Design a protein with these regions (language model features):
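C-terminal motif of bacterial Sec signal peptides marking the signal peptidase cleavage site
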Residues: 14-18
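Positively charged n-region of N-terminal signal peptides that target proteins for export
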Residues: 1-5
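N-terminal pre-ligand scaffold of iron-sulfur
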Residues: 22-100, 111-115, 131-148
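Short cysteine/histidine-rich metal-coordination sites, predominantly Zn2+-binding motifs
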Residues: 99-109, 120-133
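Short hydrophobic/aromatic-rich motifs at helix boundaries and adjacent loops
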Residues: 19-20, 107
Length: 148
């Protein structure tokens, strides 16, 4: 019995000690935006989101820093990402533009990101680069609530 207790304590000790705690790197380019945007999918403006794979862009007066890209990724799941390119300080060129299944940064470096995952598609070298900033989406019937 004592051997069993010692073994359990030993296993617990190494399990706790072997956990790696890494803090995610905060994006230094984009400030935090606070908002809560209700979207009614029955409205004509948002009806493209009723079909899987479709995306729309909301202007920044509704939420986000420069706006919000919203995509229906299927199975009643939606993803929402910041329009500002995450690898630039907000400027006149640092918006991303929807083009099919990706969004492209308008600055000269031409970063491209997936609208389904937010991942940078043309990552090169070992430089620290950021994926799109994702916002939370809650679905209730035909309503979407996008918030941060």
């Amino acid at each position: 019995m004592r051997l069993l207790n010692t073994s359990i304590a030993f296993i617990l000790f190494f399990t706790v000690c072997s956990c790696e705690s890494t803090t995610p790197v905060q994006n230094p380019f984009l400030p935090k935006a606070s908002f809560n945007v209700p979207i009614d999918l029955n409205l004509p403006l948002y009806s493209p989101l009723q079909n899987t794979g479709n995306s729309i862009t909301l202007p920044n007066n509704l939420g986000g820093i420069k706006g919000i890209h919203i995509t229906n990724v299927g199975f009643s799941t939606f993803r929402a990402f910041e329009v500002s390119c995450p690898n630039h300080n907000p400027s006149s060129c640092s918006s991303t533009e929807l083009q099919g299944s990706q969004v492209n940064c308008q600055c000269e470096d031409g970063f491209s990101y997936s609208v389904f995952t937010g991942q940078l598609l043309n990552r090169q070298g070992s430089e620290t680069l950021f994926d799109l900033t994702e916002y939370r989406v809650r679905t209730e019937g035909t309503m979407l609530y996008i918030f941060n």
